[in-house]
Each structure stands twice: as C-alpha cells, then as structure tokens.
C-alpha cells in the first residue's frame, strides 16, 4: 500500500493534519540545506581532466588584482560549472594554485578568475601576458550554492570572487538577498563597478570609511531570517560570522577561506624519508608540508586546507598522506 503523501490526523477522519504538514515541509527544507551546510563540507570529487588554456584577456580590477579570461585554443566549449567552483591553475611546471571562477556559468566559451598579487603562485599568474598558455584542472566545487528564497552574502577582499556568480544567480532567481562587501579601501576592492548595478542590495564597507568590523554580528545585521549565509574572506572574519550566526535565527553558514587555517592544539612529531634515511622534526605550530618543502624542493601544493589533494604523498604503507593537514608520524616513500 502506498503511504499518503500528506500526514493525516489521528482521529480517523482522513483529513490532513495541517500542523504536521507544516513541520514536514520545514524538515524537508532543513534536510536539503543541512546536507551541504557549512558545518560539514561535501566531498570534493577528484577531476582527472587537464585543460590546456590560453590567456585571452587580462584586466586590472583593483590595486594588486587582475582578472584573466581563459579560453581553449580552438574555441571549444569548456566543462560546465556552478557558482562556488574553482580550478587548479598551473602557470608553470610544478606550481599549482586554486582560483575561484568568477565569470558567468552560462558562458562556456571562457573561464574568468580574479587573482590578488600575494605569494609565489599569484606572482607567476600576474606575470602572464595575453596569448600565454596555462594548464587548468577542474572545475571542482567545495563551496556549493543551494537554492533558497533568500540569502546573505559576506565577502572580504578577494573573497568576492566565488561570491560574484552566486549574487548573479540569486538576482536572476528573484531571491531576496543582501551582500556585505568588506575590504581595506575601495581602491583595493575588485569588481565594484560590476556590483554597482545591484544598487542598495550591496553594502560596500571599506575599513577606511567604516573601521574594521568589531564582530561578526555587525556584518550579519539586516540578514533575512533563516537565510543561508555565504561567507568568503579572511579567517578572523569567517570565525566571527560563524560564531555570531550561531547566536541568532540564521540559516546554515557556508564558508570558504583562501588562507591557511591556523594550527590549534598541535603536537610535535617526526616524519621519515625512506630512500634518504632522513628524519625530520615537525613542530607543533607547523605542517608537514612546511617542513618537507625545506628539504625536498618542488613539492606540489595548492589549497593548503586538505581538500584539493595536490600535496598528497605516498607512505611506505601504501597510504597517501595530505601533508598540508595530516599530523601524525609517517615514513614517506621518498
């Protein structure tokens, strides 16, 4: 016998129990959102696909920030992606970094990324010229965008890149949404002109005009009740938003950080390199990746957060170790 699609009253009348029907709807929405909530990331599936691309255009978007338009040499259609996705870019052999796609998911003729000049990887990207060749892998998505009638977006600095496609999709869907965009000053904040068409839905909040946010609560003001929160930017901002969101009737917090998370409560340990017989000490406040890079030049890495897999190394046991986050004694097949 097929169960009823609506919960019935217990008095035998056969009529729908309106209270239980409402609760059933709430639970369904909760399950849909919590399945990809910021409390537990969905697995990031490996994408065994290298894309040889060409730099079709470069633009200066702000102080220290450029955007690249990347296309296939013969104009082939690129793989599909959804807001929140990123690609691994290799501007030169042995160097891999991750960058969020910030263009239009419906435009499969090109990918667009925004890159702030900070560190070795971004320096190599900024040095590229129009017509340069670059290898991409992906796209992959560790920051999934869920359907909802309302949203609050919070971006800090270059953290605007994964948020941009989400804002466009939210606007196109007719959702109720707000964006809080923070940064050092307007000159350093990319894509301001692009965002200006959304009017009062976007609060541009540079520190030079408003001061550094005192708490996450300040950035959460005016958020639609129970709306999902999407946050990308510096770690202190993300921590503040997640902490204060837990104290109010907000929806799930989805977040992505571009910097390495701090090591909290770490303990020192040792790793051994089987082929050379070298034993290395890993201090409580450093990663295996940091220590190995000083001894084994050329080790590939990218996200430094444990989900991209670029830094995986083989152990003599046959296991593969993500040396940016895993902290235990191990002997590597090196």
Question: What is each residue range found by the language model?
Answer:
Residues 3-14, 120-277, 281-284:
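FNR/FR-type flavoprotein reductase catalytic core
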């Amino acid at each position: 016998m097929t169960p009823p699609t609506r919960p019935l009253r217990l008095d035998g009348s056969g009529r729908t129990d309106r209270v239980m029907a409402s609760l059933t709807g709430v639970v369904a929405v909760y399950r849909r959102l919590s399945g990809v909530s910021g409390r537990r990331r969905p697995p990031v599936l490996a994408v065994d696909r290298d894309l040889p691309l060409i730099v079709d255009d470069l633009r200066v978007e702000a102080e220290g920030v450029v955007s690249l338009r990347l296309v296939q040499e013969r104009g082939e259609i690129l793989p599909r992606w959804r807001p929140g996705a990123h690609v691994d870019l290799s501007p030169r052999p042995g160097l891999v970094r991750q960058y969020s796609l910030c263009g239009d998911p419906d435009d499969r003729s090109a990918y667009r990324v925004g890159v702030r000049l900070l560190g070795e990887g971004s320096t190599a990207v900024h040095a590229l010229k129009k017509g340069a060749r670059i290898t991409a892998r992906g796209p992959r998505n560790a920051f999934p965008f869920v359907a909802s009638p309302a949203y609050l977006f919070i971006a800090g600095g270059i953290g605007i890149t994964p948020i941009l496609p989400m804002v466009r999709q939210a606007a196109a869907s007719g959702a109720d949404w707000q964006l809080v965009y923070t940064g050092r000053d307007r000159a350093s904040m990319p894509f301001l002109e692009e965002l200006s068409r959304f009017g009062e839905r976007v609060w541009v909040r540079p520190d030079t005009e408003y001061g550094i946010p005192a708490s996450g609560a300040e950035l959460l003001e005016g958020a639609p009740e129970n709306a999902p929160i999407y946050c990308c930017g510096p770690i202190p901002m993300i921590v503040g938003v997640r902490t204060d969101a837990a104290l109010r009737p907000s929806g799930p917090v989805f977040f992505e950080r571009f910097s390495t998370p701090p090591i909290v409560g770490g303990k020192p340990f040792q790793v051994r390199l089987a082929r050379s017989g070298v034993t290395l000490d890993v201090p409580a406040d450093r990663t295996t990746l940091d220590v190995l890079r000083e001894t084994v030049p050329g080790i590939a890495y990218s996200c430094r957060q444990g989900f991209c897999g670029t830094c995986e190394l083989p152990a003599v046991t046959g296991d593969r170790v993500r040396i940016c986050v895993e902290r235990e004694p191990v002997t590597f097949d090196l």
